[in-house]
Amino acid sequence: MAKLFASVKRLPVLAGCVLAAASYPPIPADLTTPVQQRLAINGPNSFSIGWNTYQKLDQPCVQYGTSSDELTQQACSSASVTYATSRTYSNVVTLADLSPATTYYYKIVSTNSSVEHFFSPRVAGDTTPFSMNAVIDMGVYGVDGYTIQMDEAKRDTIPTIDPSLNHTTINQLANTVDDYEFIVHPGDFAYADDWYLKTKNILDGEDAFQAILEQFYAQLSPISGRKAYMASPGNHEAACQEIIVGLCPTGQKNFTDFMTRFGETMSTAFPSTSAAEAAKINANKAQLLAKPPFWYSFEYGMVHFVMINTETDFDNAPDGQGGSAGLNSGPFGAPDQQLEFLEADLSSVDRTVTPWLLIGGHRPWYTTGGGGCDSCQAAFEPLLYKYGVDLAIFGHVHNSQRFQPVFNNTADPNGLDDPTAPMYIVAGGAGNIEGLSDVGSNLTYNRFAYADDFSYAKISFLDANNLQVDFIRSATGEVLDTSVLYKSHKAQFVVQ
C-alpha cells in the first residue's frame, strides 16, 4: 500500500487540475424501477428479496409462484429506508413457507420490472450434493474501478488506462450460474472508499462514493438477483475512505450503507432440528445474540454456515474504536456479544443433521504475503478448533490461497485425511481497483497460492464426508487448484 499512499499525498496538486465528475448511473424515468436486486437465505424455507428504488415505496411488494405465468402469491412489507447522502431507498420483502429446493419465479411489483427466478433453500439434513462459491474483495469495474487490461505486475498503483467494461469474475459467475446454489461474500464490496484513486473524483468525493456503490450493485445484480448472496463486512465497508475518517459525511461512515443494504435480508440463526435438547437451547441463544449482517448463521442441506465480523466487536478489533485501522467503527453489539453468539452457535451444530461446519470472515490470520490479523486469531481461532470447524473462508489479501489444516500455527499431521484442525483458504482475488497482492513468503503449511489473475473459490459438498475446494480462474473458468477434504464426522457434537 506504500505506493498507493504516496499517490494520495499528491491529491491537493491534482485537485486544481480537474473538474468534479462523479459517474452516477442514470435515474430511470419510472422511479419505482427496481435496481441493485439481491437475494438471501433468511430462515428455514424463507428467502428475502432486496432491491433499491429512486423513491420511497409506501409498500414494497413481491409477487411469486412456481410458474412464471402464475405468480399467485404476494408478500409485502413496510421496509423502504435510506440514509444521508444516498440517492436510493433500500426495500426488503421476505417470502416465507416456501417449498424446499424448488424453482420459484418472482416479480418485484413495479410498472417497470420483469419476472426473475431463484432456487429455494434446501432443508437442513438434505444430503443432495451441491456447490457454492466464495467471492471476496470484489470491486466496481469501469470508469471508477479496475479493468481487465490492468497490468497486474504493478501492485497498489492507480490504473490510468481506459476501461473495458468486462468484469471477469461476475462474467464467470453468470456463465456458470446453474453450477452453484449460493454465494458467500465475506467483506469488501465495491471499493467505494477508493474513490480518490481516480482524479476526476477528487473535488466530489461524497457523490463519487455513492456513485461507485450504485454502479457496483447494479453490476452485481444479474447474479445477486438470481442466487442467494450472503454478505458479511470487510474494512472497505466502514467509511468513505481509510485515511482521515473524520472527514466522512454522515451516511458514509460506521458501515452505514452495508447495514442499510443487507441488515434486513440476512438471517439470524436457524432453530435447531436436532433431537438433542441442548442443541435447541444453544441455537435459540445464538438466534438472540445474532446481529445480521455482521454475525449470523444459516443452514443449507449438509452445511451449517457461520458468518463472523473480523472488523469490530472483539478485543483489539482493527476497525473498532481505537483499532489499528483507524476507522473507529462500532460496536454493534454488547460487550462479548459476537463471541458469545459464536460459541452458542457452534455448540448447537448436530453433525448428524448438518455434517459440514463452515466459517466465513474477512480478515485471515493465515496468509502467505502479510496482512494476517493477530487479534482475529486470538479472538476466533480457539472456538473454531474447539467445535471442529471444517473449513474457514477469508479474504482481505487480494489473491487465492489454500492451507493444510492448521491450529495455533502448527499444521495438522493428518493433512486432508480427517484432521481435527480447520482447513483455511483465502479467496480474495476476485478483482478490485487496488489490484492483486503478491504471494509473498510461502509458509510451510501453505499448499497453493495464486496472484497472476483474478480468481475465486468453488466449494462442493460431495457427501457427508467429502468436501471439494476448487480455485477458479475468472477469465477462463479453468481450475487452478483442487483439493478434497475428508472428515469422518463420527461425533454428533464436536468438543475438543
Functional labels for PLM-detected ranges:
Residues 443, 453-455:
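C-terminal structured "cap/appendage" subdomains that terminate the fold
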Residues 26-436, 448-450, 458-496:
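Metal-dependent phosphoester/phosphodiester hydrolase catalytic core
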Residues 7, 20-23, 350:
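Residue-level detector of alpha-helical hydrophobic segments embedded in or interacting with membranes
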Residues 1-14:
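Classical eukaryotic N-terminal signal peptides for Sec-dependent ER targeting/secretion
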Residues 15-29:
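N-terminal signal peptide
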Residues 440-448:
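An anionic, turn-rich surface loop/hairpin at beta-sheet edges
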Residues 11, 18-20, 301:
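N-terminal processing/targeting junctions
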